[in-house]
Amino acid sequence: MAAQKDLWDAIVIGAGIQGCFTAYHLAKHRKRILLLEQFFLPHSRGSSHGQSRIIRKAYLEDFYTRMMHECYQIWAQLEHEAGTQLHRQTGLLLLGMKENQELKTIQANLSRQRVEHQCLSSEELKQRFPNIRLPRGEVGLLDNSGGVIYAYKALRALQDAIRQLGGIVRDGEKVVEINPGLLVTVKTTSRSYQAKSLVITAGPWTNQLLRPLGIEMPLQTLRINVCYWREMVPGSYGVSQAFPCFLWLGLCPHHIYGLPTGEYPGLMKVSYHHGNHADPEERDCPTARTDIGDVQILSSFVRDHLPDLKPEPAVIESCMYTNTPDEQFILDRHPKYDNIVIGAGFSGHGFKLAPVVGKILYELSMKLTPSYDLAPFRISRFPSLGKAHL
């Protein structure tokens, strides 16, 4: 039995946005919390780095829209505590053909949940956004709540807040062994720790930690090319021109999204919501970078629809997605060890939802009643994960 001073209420593995918000909620509730990160902070090896992410209430699934109501409140609270701007409201423009079922469902969801939005005809789109070239029959849905989260600033603010609340953040410590039990023992490259509860938010490394615990999630790890495109006239796609974030539906097998210029002067982020299979340990090997089909898709898209951008990317960065088969999150306890909690499979859309995800993982780790219905996020929805894996 660990001495009381060496015993943590909870250990969180992974200091990306989900792990940081989990540790933040634990520390807010005065729990003795240790946040472990295998890389030295800050780093760009996972899914939470970079300067910006889209924030929105526009979702196909009504449960995400409900969660986003509270997410906005917690983002604002963190912004107030940090004393720095973490969010900018720009609006989010969803584009698609008038008959696009996804667009119709999102609009119905926004109406049902009384989220302020506008439906824009082709003519209205041309008048408001003349530097978008639209196919015939294309319409728009503007989610007024949409905008940009300053990702790196948010991570730094969270890590500072965790420390100020008495939590401990230890980076450069890779977890090499987890021993379950009434107390969970976590062994890193530096030392061993014990805790009453363990939360695993390890992104594309999740299954490496779970396999020795007798379970493997159906997770697909992808390397994403995050592309930036140069404006021909600086500022033409900027916030100063009231240009919004956008999400284009139905043109390709996966969505194309964009954010107004800001991260790099004169460059606009436009990326494809998909990528190539990649082991997170090998994502930057030359062999992992041979397939640039998504960049070619984007070049064609930019040439055809964003005429004031040069159609060759000026900057290409990498990011990891960890996708589930249905692209919904995994927020659940280990089927055998109820003091081990798993947060995984954020499928490229988890950053904005992290304030509530962290709250849910905190509640699960402390054996509290979750604030939300977790049916969409249960491990049991994957029938292949039966008792044979345990």
Swiss-Prot record:
<feature type="modified residue" description="N6-acetyllysine">
    <location>
        <position position="126"/>
    </location>
</feature>
<keyword id="KW-0285">Flavoprotein</keyword>
<dbReference type="InterPro" id="IPR006076">
    <property type="entry name" value="FAD-dep_OxRdtase"/>
</dbReference>
<dbReference type="GO" id="GO:0005782">
    <property type="term" value="C:peroxisomal matrix"/>
</dbReference>
<feature type="modified residue" description="S-8alpha-FAD cysteine">
    <location>
        <position position="319"/>
    </location>
</feature>
<feature type="short sequence motif" description="Microbody targeting signal">
    <location>
        <begin position="388"/>
        <end position="390"/>
    </location>
</feature>
<keyword id="KW-0274">FAD</keyword>
<comment type="similarity">
    <text>Belongs to the MSOX/MTOX family.</text>
</comment>
<dbReference type="GO" id="GO:0008115">
    <property type="term" value="F:sarcosine oxidase activity"/>
</dbReference>
<keyword id="KW-0007">Acetylation</keyword>
<feature type="binding site">
    <location>
        <begin position="9"/>
        <end position="39"/>
    </location>
    <ligand>
        <name>FAD</name>
    </ligand>
</feature>
<keyword id="KW-0560">Oxidoreductase</keyword>
<dbReference type="Pfam" id="PF01266">
    <property type="entry name" value="DAO"/>
</dbReference>
<dbReference type="GO" id="GO:0033514">
    <property type="term" value="P:L-lysine catabolic process to acetyl-CoA via L-pipecolate"/>
</dbReference>
<dbReference type="GO" id="GO:0050031">
    <property type="term" value="F:L-pipecolate oxidase activity"/>
</dbReference>
<comment type="function">
    <text>Metabolizes sarcosine and L-pipecolic acid.</text>
</comment>
<dbReference type="GO" id="GO:0006554">
    <property type="term" value="P:lysine catabolic process"/>
</dbReference>
<dbReference type="GO" id="GO:0050660">
    <property type="term" value="F:flavin adenine dinucleotide binding"/>
</dbReference>
<keyword id="KW-0576">Peroxisome</keyword>
<dbReference type="GO" id="GO:0005829">
    <property type="term" value="C:cytosol"/>
</dbReference>
<dbReference type="InterPro" id="IPR045170">
    <property type="entry name" value="MTOX"/>
</dbReference>
<dbReference type="InterPro" id="IPR036188">
    <property type="entry name" value="FAD/NAD-bd_sf"/>
</dbReference>
<protein>
    <recommendedName>
        <fullName>Peroxisomal sarcosine oxidase</fullName>
        <ecNumber>1.5.3.1</ecNumber>
        <ecNumber>1.5.3.7</ecNumber>
    </recommendedName>
</protein>
<dbReference type="GO" id="GO:0005777">
    <property type="term" value="C:peroxisome"/>
</dbReference>
